[in-house]
Amino acid sequence: MVQSEYDVVTHFETLYQRADAEFAFEAETREAWLAWQSAFRSRLREALGLDIIAANLEGYVPAAEQVGREDRGDHVRESWRLWVEPTVPLPFYLLRPKSPPTSGDLPLVLTPHGHGRPYMYVGIFHTEEERKKLEVGERDIAVQAVRQGYLALAPTTRAFGDTRTVADKEADRIHSCRTQLVRDLLVGRTPIGDRVWDISRLIDWALKALPVDADRIAITGNSGGGTVSLFAAACDTRIGVAVPSSYFCTFTGSIGAMRHCGCNYVPGILRMGEMYDVAGLIAPRPFCAIAGEEDPIFPIEHAREAFSHLKRVYEVAGVPERCQLYVGDGGHRYYKDGAWPFVRRYFDVLIS
């Protein structure tokens, strides 16, 4: 039907319906599921720009430098930089438990942050507003991890902190995501791809430099950190447990329905699959999506819809119990009660 007046919602909902996703999950057997994963993961890596980065940096080995150390009582907080690209010294924090519950290699948890200050995930705040945001939203995620007895890596998300533009640093803007997006697009890359690349290089480094149990690697972060958690686990199968918070939803019901930061977007993603299809690349590894009942930007009804689709992937994989949705009673924030019991359960299984 031809409309007499333009309506932006109707127009784009029509486009979404016509996207005809190539990798919409339809497998009924284990063999078909594995073939779907292999083909989709390869295509997703290409779309994110990971293949371009890998080709441009073939043979490159990142160097690391420690720049600080502080005793925090029950753990040690170290500051590091890792040259994830020759032109990108990426800051990150390493938190080490002083009294781990077991001897030998330790589990590793990566805690990518979202649209906030990188230091908040390690419990640092500089203003009363930051303190309240950290405490109410349970955003000291790396500290939570190290207090579970795990090694924790809290990287700066690309386009934040020291990886902002000079102008954004001078103006004390939180991020430079738009600059990252538009310049990445010129060379076939994406901010999500950059951030997934960084996570994989941190895992490379940790496995060589730290006493890490390679079978017990988890990733969890809130909002934009949930984005990185989901896509990194979809692309890098070394990540054994994925717990994205305040992100898992449908693309059409969240970033396709309201204003979101440009760093969330991957060109043509709906022609490949919905968010639950991307998350399906994590199966059979344990996956728990944390959501807020009152989250205004990743609405719970669309999170539940996405979860119903994702459960089907885990059913075909033969492990439906490994796919969970935890719903907190608040808004867009982290809910630690949805994270650590789930992580512990599967870390314990992996050593039993």
Regions found by a protein language model. Give the residues of each.
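Mobile cap/lid helix-loop segments that gate and shape the active-site cleft of serine hydrolases
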Residues: 179, 183-186, 201, 239-280, ...
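Cap/lid segment of the alpha/beta-hydrolase catalytic domain
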Residues: 104, 110-208, 253-258
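Short beta-strand/loop motif that positions the catalytic acidic residue
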Residues: 282, 289-291
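Glycine-rich active-site/cofactor-binding loop and its immediate structural neighborhood
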Residues: 67-130
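Glycine-rich nucleophile elbow surrounding the catalytic serine of serine-hydrolase chemistry
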Residues: 221-231
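C-terminal catalytic histidine-bearing segment of alpha/beta-hydrolase fold enzymes
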Residues: 308-352
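N-terminal targeting or regulatory segments adjacent to alpha/beta-hydrolase or S9 domains
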Residues: 1-76, 84, 352
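Alpha/beta-hydrolase fold nucleophile elbow
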Residues: 211-223
